[in-house]
Amino acid sequence: MAKKVVTDLDLKNKKVLVRVDFNVPMKDGKITNDNRIVAALPTIEYILEQNGKAILFSHLGKVKTEEDKEGKSLRPVAARLSELLGKEVKFVPTTRGPELEKAVDELKDGEVLLFENTRFEDIDGKKESKNDPELGKYWASLGDVFVNDAFGTAHRAHASNVGIASNLESAAGFLMEKEIKFIGGVVDNPARPLVAILGGAKVSDKIGVIENLLTKADKVLVGGGMTFTFMAAQGQEIGKSLLEADKVELAKGLLEKAGDKLVLPVDAVVSKEFSNDAPFHTVSADSIPADEMGLDIGQATIDLFTKELQGAKTVVWNGPMGVFELSNFAKGTIGVCEAIANLTDATTIIGGGDSAAAAMDLGFADKFTHISTGGGASLEYLEGKELPGVASISDK
């Protein structure tokens, strides 16, 4: 990649600012999933091995008012990171000022500091989220070099990524490098055949991705709630299934443009209610009863998608095939997950979000070449958009 990577920087005795993505789920002040912290370890450990001083920062959730601060402190993250690294992580409960500056000045080579949630700066005028130039300059003044390892926020131009990068020599961390290699590779130079599997509820969320991938992929398999808008566009009866009526014309246009590249489900698991307790059965995709709704793809579609995947050299999957939170309607997502996991000769990529969660919950995480850490960022990358957080990293 043409962007600098952390290994291109001289880190010895340097104060290294690191934008990590520690936006982890919390419940009652406890971290419920530390995947994102674990994902940042290679970059942090490399900086420490090189005798750099690691100054870490991240956002956590949305913070708009003083009340929002409750439960949004990164203090529990510092404690967990300390356990994972096997060394003390100094926590500074502020985002600017003398306390932070003193802690940074006193940091020794090979030591780690984490300062408070960058979005605490959003309470007074959205300084972080609107990329306030003074804030970016201030944070940049705390370090000698900047490493951006937060792919999850790469689609946003914030003070903590773009703002700092415009004031300091910067490089991608190992996680960011991996994301650019795999997600970027799908868009720029995939091994063929490239098969994309897109799920999720709304066509509107995935229009850009479908349009872009129809020009890149050899096949695009569509599942999830958005299939019903496509079926309606073909004149099929979809009962009470999810429909974006204002997107039917658009779906028609996509179907015409796609020809046989776009593959839709041939059956659906339907029920009268959006519930795990209601009776359910499988019907052909063109005969969904008027009083029922499709909540998953059926076995015939799983078999069809499995067949379409055979021989693929690159597979990218984004979005579940049904309401996978309800066990009765999770079989489609599990089936697709298994089909991709069983491909031995392909680069297999999950584009973050719900599909990543599904693969991890099902124990398939190690069967994929790459599971993206960024939901929105992956989607925008797959749409072919330039990501500000990536664009702002120094070129080699």
Swiss-Prot record:
Q: Where does ATP bind?
A: 206, 294, 325, 352-355
Can you list the GO cellular component terms from the UniProt entry?
Answer: cytosol
- Keyword match ATP-binding: yes
- A GO molecular-function descriptor: phosphoglycerate kinase activity
CDD domains, sorted = Phosphoglycerate_kinase
What pathway does this protein act in?
A: Carbohydrate degradation; glycolysis; pyruvate from D-glyceraldehyde 3-phosphate: step 2/5
Name by which UniProt lists this protein: Phosphoglycerate kinase
Q: Where does substrate bind?
A: 21-23, 36, 59-62, 119, 156
Q: Which superkingdom heads the taxonomic lineage of this protein's source?
A: Bacteria
Instruction: Tell me the subunit arrangement.
Output: Monomer.
Task: Supply the alphabetized keyword list.
Answer: ATP-binding, Cytoplasm, Glycolysis, Kinase, Nucleotide-binding, Transferase
Q: Identify the Pfam families for this entry.
A: PGK
Which reaction(s) does the protein catalyse, per the Swiss-Prot or TrEMBL entry?
A: (2R)-3-phosphoglycerate + ATP = (2R)-3-phospho-glyceroyl phosphate + ADP
Subcellular location field: Cytoplasm
- Name the InterPro entries on file: Phosphoglycerate_kinase, Phosphoglycerate_kinase_CS, Phosphoglycerate_kinase_N, Phosphoglycerate_kinase_sf
| EC numbers, comma separated | 2.7.2.3
What's the gene?
pgk
Single GO BP term: gluconeogenesis
Q: Which family does it belong to?
A: Belongs to the phosphoglycerate kinase family.
